[in-house]
Amino acid sequence: MNSKIEEMRITLIETAQKYGMNSKETIQCSQELDILLNTRIKEEMIFGRYLENSRM
C-alpha cells in the first residue's frame, strides 16, 4: 500500500506541474490519492483495534 501511495503522490505532483493545481487531471489524481490514504487509515484503525482486542 505504501508504494501505491508514494507512486500516486509523485503522479499528483507531476500532474500539478504539467496541468496546474486546479486542472481536472490534478483534481482526479488528488481524489485518487485521498482514497488510498483513507483506505490506509481505515486499515490501520482496524488492525490497531484487532491488536488491542487480542491482548485481552
From Swiss-Prot:
Q: What keywords are annotated for this sequence in UniProt?
A: Hydrolase, Sporulation
Which SUPFAM superfamilies does the record cross-reference, listed alphabetically? BAS1536-like
Q: Which domain of life is it from?
A: Bacteria
Listed GO molecular functions? hydrolase activity; protein dimerization activity
Q: Which GO terms describe its biological process?
A: regulation of sporulation; sporulation resulting in formation of a cellular spore
Q: Enumerate the InterPro entries for this protein.
A: HLH_DNA-bd_sf, Spo0E-like, Spo0E-like_phosphatase, Spo0E-like_sf
Q: What induces it?
A: During exponential phase and in conditions antithetical to sporulation.
Q: What is its EC number?
A: 3.1.3.-
Gene3D superfamilies xref list: Helix-loop-helix DNA-binding domain
Which family does the record assign? Answer: Belongs to the spo0E family.
Function of the molecule: Aspartyl-phosphate phosphatase which specifically dephosphorylates the sporulation transcription factor Spo0A-P and negatively regulates the sporulation initiation pathway in order to control the proper timing of sporulation.
Record's protein name = Aspartyl-phosphate phosphatase YisI
> From which organism does this entry originate?
Bacillus subtilis (strain 168)
Organismal lineage: Bacteria, Bacillati, Bacillota, Bacilli, Bacillales
